[in-house]
Amino acid sequence: MSSSPFTNLGNLDTEAIYENKENEYQTNITNETSNVQNLSSGNDDQQYPNSTNDDANNGLTASQAKLQDIAAVTLFQDNNISTTTLAPPSPSPLRLNEAPRRRGRPRKYPPKPIDEGSEPIIKRKRGRPPKIKSSSPSTKLDDPLKPKRGRGRPRLHPLPVVQPSVDEGTTQNNLQMGLDEPNIIEGFAEGHANLSELKPKRGRGRPRKIKPEEGSSSQNGLSPLVVLPAKRGRGRPPLHRSEQKIANTPISNNVTVESTGTNLHTHSQLNPENEQSSSEFYSLNPQSEIRKEVVVTDQPLFSTADVPVKRKRGRPPLNKPKILFGTSTENKIDENRPKRGRGRPRLERPSGLPLDSKSQSLFKRKRGRPPKIASGIVPLSAFTRKHEDMLHDSDALSLKHFAITSPNNQQFLNNQQRESAPLLPRKRGRPPKKRQENAEIRNITPGLTDSSVHSSSATPQSESSSPNSVSPLLPSSDRLPLLRQSQFTPPPKKPNFEVAIISPKKSQHKLYPNPVVESVFNDVPYSEIDSQLHTIKSTIAARLCGKSHIPLVGHMDEQTKLYQWVRQTIVLGEGNSVIIVGPRGSGKSVLVDDILSRAAQEINEKSYVVRLNGTYQTDDKLALREISRQLSIELESIESDEALKSEMNFSDTLTKLLATLSHPVDLGIAEDVMTTSAAVIFVLEEFDLFVQHSRQMLLYNLFDIAQSRKAPILIIGLTTRYDCSESLEKRVKSRFSHMVIPMRPPSSLSEFEQILKSVLYVSDEGGKDQIITCWNQRVDELLSDTRSHLHKLVQHHYFASRNLKLLYVDLLFPILSMAPDRPLLADEDFANISLKVSDHKVELVKNLSLLELALLICAVRFEARDIPACNFNSAYQEYRQLHQSSVINAAASGALAHSSRLWGRDVALEAWETLGSIGLIIPVHPSTNVSGALSRQCQLWQPEVDINVVSVGLREHRRLPSHYYRWLKEVI
């Protein structure tokens, strides 16, 4: 049998053996772990150099063989220990009681040994520690008078300790019987098992006020406990709240409590010996600041000791009787006194006046206006010689002559004692005017006439001679009462002595024709006057409507430049292009018409004029069709129509149309270089709209023909935009001649009137026609007079817009309304210009919403800046800028809020299309098909109304913000 290290361990302690075994086991594990780490690092062959071939044959490495050896040694040692003959050691109680090791951080301190007699310690849980419950029977019961400690914040002021008091007689009896006071209290606590119910459980929050229980202290001769005030409820406190708490009284005592006001009276029917004890029986609250007096009286009263009910909110009911405790004769209410009602307080009746029906009617307050107090005015018939002294002293007039109240007419006549004051009640309405001191005084008798009044006032007479007359010796003092008429004479509507003051009217200036001029028409027959008047009316109406030429006034430099370029084109065959820029009404079209008419008279060469308008020719195809139509009329041929119908491109079609007008040398017709073909002058009105055409094909071909030697043409563009030349494409701009003529509007009122004279004047070739001469003189007379209505009308248009076309519209109706019986202009015809039929566009403008009106103002602002067309995007951007500037101005002026809001883009787009549907704005390209939101926003529109129509609509608009006027005035 092989020797083992565990064979001679019989005398050793088993615990030491197990400890040594555990230490060796831990040491071996540590060493083997380090060896395994060394083997993994590559030192297996050095530590096991003599590895057998069997291991190699089995496919095991040196490290794996070493691990097998360690496992075999460990298994062998365990088998030896388990098969030893030694008795197994008894397990240690420390190991048996030790709880299994859990995962986590190792224990810092080993567990303490547990005593055999002690109870196992329960593991402490999180949260509030549990209360320790003691099971010892020696624990005494808690004091029932001590409240239970509750949760929450500790009480700020501890409750007072209640000590029951014992009467003196009871104490002496207890002492004689050998009982002391603590035993009595202990017996009292044992006899009252439910005494703890007096102290409610202490709850969370604010400490509860303790309320006494009924009948808890009325026995055993104990005095009542100290009573704390009741818990203060929420809301408004009651109107009359007694702050004194009274304990229940014994049944044998008759107690009456009278609660009147703020005092508390207690009446008790007690013996004198018990008065002191009864007064001590009621204890006051020590915490109350104000204590009420307790008055004890011996007078017995018949009442009960009811506690007053808590007063409810609101007005007390009317049908509920008033409860009085301890009533007496002094507090009795008069039953005859009427019930107090709502409204104005009742007028008190004097004490000395008897209460009868007459006095009640006298002092009863009625509804409505109070009655008029009787006036001290005395009729004239009551005055005699003996009353003259009384008139000088107002104090001598006693009130006994006048009525106390205002009776009706029948009572007034039946009262014989008040004949001296026959006055009627004051009527409603405006009081009569104060009569003058020196005014004539009429007699109240119906028999007196106006003549007698004048005679009596002029010559004084005695009373006997004229009893019905007025005494002239009446005093002129201010204290003299005014006289009134009696009930028999109706009052006059207006006194004769009152004079109506009327301010004189200003003489209206009227301009009548000169009588010398009128005498001329007397010698002329009616038929001749009618024919001459018809000629004058047709000539001036054609000028006002733009159908005939108007003579140009001023602009001499502009006329010289344009005439020179026209002459070079017609005579020398040069091609040029020029743009005339200026605001509306400045005379651009008049300048072109004047130069063309002058060239037609002075130049013998043949030329043609083609007029195009960007408002009507919205695309190049329509413009080409209009050119072909006008040239075919001028040339009287059909080649233009055939060329238009052929399938050719735009440039070839335009070249073929102008082929007949090309240079003769190019066509091979003539060999003379000085010979030229007929010139063509293109007048393009609204030139900026042609610039907006796609690719600008029309302008490119016209400028290209003008720069080349194909045909002598002159392109004259009329526009209101000063930046129109900058909008040209690069290829079009390179072929433009860059010649611009600016035009300015009339700069003075005299120049404005001079232009109007040139329109209203009718030319007389020989000066032999007297009717035309009188017409021109009448025009000069009306325009030169500053008081005439025609001159005022011209001033209005000059300072408002300086637009002659608007003035022409106002002059058209008075001129066409002339007749042969009145062949000259009348100034009254121009005074009723404001009474003409209102424009329907003004009605449309004043019925617009605020958003629609704002967008229309933005479109008009663009037109005032010489931008006749705009789209929705530009109008909405202008609207946003105006709104932001208004908000900034309002904030700078100290306003808290702005009066209008900024509308969104979608809502504004609908409002913009509404303006187009009602005709206030019209599209520039009506023939194009608009589709999609982007096309709707980018489509060009131009306003159909001018700034004057919008300003009139703003004045008639209701509830319009002030900044809308400012937006419009910024461009005027």
Swiss-Prot record:
Domain of life, per the record?
Answer: Eukaryota
Pfam families cross-referenced by the UniProt entry: AAA_16 (PF13191), AT_hook (PF02178), ORC4_C (PF14629)
Kindly list the GO molecular function terms attached to this UniProt entry. ATP binding; ATP hydrolysis activity; DNA replication origin binding; protein-macromolecule adaptor activity
Q: Which GO terms describe its biological process?
A: DNA replication initiation; DNA topological change
Residues covered by region (Disordered)? 31-59, 82-172, 193-223, 310-374, 408-477
Regarding protein family, the annotation reads: Belongs to the ORC4 family.
The protein here is known as Origin recognition complex subunit 4
Q: Which organism is it from?
A: Schizosaccharomyces pombe (strain 972 / ATCC 24843)
